[in-house]
Amino acid sequence: MNQLAVKFRRLAHAGDLALPSYATSGAAGLDLAAAIDQPICLKPNMREAIPTGFAMALPAGYEAQIRPRSGLALTYGITVANAPGTIDSDYRGEIAVILVNSGTDDFTITHGMRIAQMVIAAVTIMTPVEADDLDDTARAAGGFGSTGL
C-alpha cells in the first residue's frame, strides 16, 4: 500500500469537522462530511453542491475521485451526480460534492454527515496520436450491448 502526505486547508465553515479520514484500515476512500450551517433537504430528483469545508494540495501526478457512499446510495438513493467527480492536482478551491436524490423520499443532509468518499489515484498522461487505421480486435466497433447483457 502506497502512502502519500497531502496538505489540507480548513475553511472557516468546516467548524468542528475532523479532517477527511479512512473509516477502516482497509478502506480505499476517505470519508467526506458536509460543512453546512443549516440542514439541506434534497427532494427527489434534486441535486445540490455540498461543501466539505476543506481545500487540499494534491501533488502533480495524482487526482482525487469523489464517489458515492454505498450505504446512502442503497438505503436512500443518494449518490454523486457526476460519479466519479474528479479533482485535479492543480485545483486549490474547496472540495464540494454534487449530491443527487434518486430516491422517492426527501433526504436531509446535516452538518458533519458523511456524504461521499474520496479515492486518490495516480494519473497517466496520454498523448493522442492521430492515425488512419487502428489495430483490429475481435470486438471491432461493437458498441453498447455488443458483448451481451
Regions found by a protein language model. Give the residues of each.
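DUTPase catalytic domain/fold
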Residues: 1-149
